[in-house]
Amino acid sequence: QYHASHILWLLLFLLSFLLLALDWIYDWRFNRSLVEQGDKWLLLSGHIVNMIWSNWLLNITGLAIVEFFLSSHASFRQWLLVILVAAGVISAGVWWWLPDIKYYVGLSGVLHGLFLYGALRETRFYPLSGYVLTTVLIGKLTWEFFNGALPGSEDMTGGRVLTEAHLLGAVGGIIVWLAECLPYLFDRLFNNKS
């Protein structure tokens, strides 16, 4: 069934494909020195480009999973907000928390935000699968936090997997989800005293 957010996923697919096919990774990646010189747009564009085709394929597969299984749980605007907030949180985190990172590329951090947001939204419609997916994602993030990238993932991506970006992206997804839930929770707590 068609959902307006499919346009968003298609745009991400096409843009990331073209940037890799045209070998524009170096022009669009997060580049700390260029950002310091005023190219602030690189704070967002770095999330669209990928290092190599296998990295792109992994990210697009993740995007397809979000599209086919989770996208109907939120509107185009909500998904776009998750993408922008997750990308912003990742870029801020890389900028302030990881000052030794000079370059960053990849959609995987934003994907973690999309997945966690989608899983939390899924708990409203399909509680069992929503809670299972949320638990699996938190387990994966916990593993990565303490142990680094999953075995074999750096071979598939062609470089270092910045697991901190996965965690930061997930935080971005949670921020959007909480921003949507808090008004409802406050209303229930303070206005529905039945």
Regions flagged by a language model, labelled:
Residues 1-4, 10-14, 48, 144-194:
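C-terminal transmembrane module of polytopic alpha-helical membrane proteins
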Residues 17, 68, 91-96, 114, ...:
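Alpha-helical transmembrane segments of multipass membrane proteins
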Residues 1-3, 68-78, 121-129, 186:
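Membrane-interface helix-boundary motifs at transmembrane edges
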Residues 3-10, 78-82, 128-135, 164-167:
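Alpha-helical transmembrane segments of integral membrane proteins
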Residues 17, 63, 88, 134-145, ...:
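Hydrophobic alpha-helical transmembrane segments of multipass integral membrane proteins
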Residues 9-85, 91-104, 156-163:
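N-terminal TM1-TM2 helical hairpin plus the immediately adjacent luminal interfacial "cap"
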Residues 100, 106-149:
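Multi-pass alpha-helical transmembrane bundles in non-GPCR membrane proteins
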Residues 54-63, 105-116, 158-180:
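Alpha-helical transmembrane segments that form the membrane-embedded catalytic/substrate-binding core
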